[in-house]
Amino acid sequence: QLSPSEAEAVLAHELGHFKHKHILKSIVISILGSLLAFYILGLLYHWQPFYQGHGVNHISSYMGLALFSMVSGVYTFWTTPIFTWLSRKNEFEADRFAAKYSSADQLIGSLIKLYKENASTLTPDPVFSAYYHSHPPASIRIKTLEKLGDT
C-alpha cells in the first residue's frame, strides 16, 4: 500500500508521460510500424522465394499471413533494443518530471514497494533487460532519482 505522498509521486510520474506526449509518440510509432509491416507483407505474400526460403511450397494469402507472422520476429529481433531504449528514455523523463513537481524520495519509496509487490527483481540481468524490459531496472532509476532527490 502506497502512502498518499508516494501515490502523489506516482501520479506525477504518469503526468510526466502526458506532459511529454509519450503516449501519443508511442501510438504514432506503433501505427507507422504496423503500416510498414503491412507494406512488407504486401510485397512478400505473392513472392515465391519468401515461401521457398522458409520451406513452404503452398502459396496462398492465408499461408503468407501465417508465415509472415511466424518469421517476422526473427527479422525484427535486432530492432527490439531501439524500442526498449525509447521506452526507458521516456521513463527517465517521467521520473525527472515527478522529482521536479512532486518528490524524488517518495517516488523511490513507491518504486521499491511496487517492485516488491510485483515480485520483480531490483537487479535484473543487464543484457536480458536491455532487450525485453520497457522500464529501466529499479536500481538504476533509484540511483538517478537520488541524484535529483529532495534531501
Residue ranges and their predicted role:
Residues 69-81:
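Hydrophobic alpha-helical transmembrane segments of polytopic membrane proteins
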